[in-house]
């Protein structure tokens, strides 16, 4: 289990990233820090590509009890969130 996520979920995220020309995905939040619980959501910062298609692929096609919070880093993002991602984030796709 890499990045505190099941390997199957990482493979699905990677496949959707490739399909949608995503440049980079950063895991952030409690799962990146390692202080998550089994009910913690999965926070993903997404750079480049077709964000909308990627977002819907994640929401509709990953068969897991995990919930996902997916942030488009190409849109307006608060400085506070950017700093959190830079501080705690782990690149899971590039």
Show which residues each predicted segment covers.
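Catalytic core of pol beta-like nucleotidyltransferases
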Residues: 1-24, 32-38, 47-94
């Amino acid at each position: 289990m890499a990045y505190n996520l099941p390997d199957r979920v990482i493979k699905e995220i990677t496949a959707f990233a490739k399909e949608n020309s995503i440049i980079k995905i950063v895991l952030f939040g409690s799962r990146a820090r390692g202080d998550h619980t089994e009910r913690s959501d999965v926070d993903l910062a997404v750079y480049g590509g077709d964000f909308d298609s990627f977002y819907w692929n994640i929401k509709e096609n990953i068969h897991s009890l995990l919930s996902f919070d997916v942030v488009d880093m190409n849109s307006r993002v608060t400085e506070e969130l950017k700093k959190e991602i830079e501080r705690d984030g782990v690149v899971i796709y590039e």
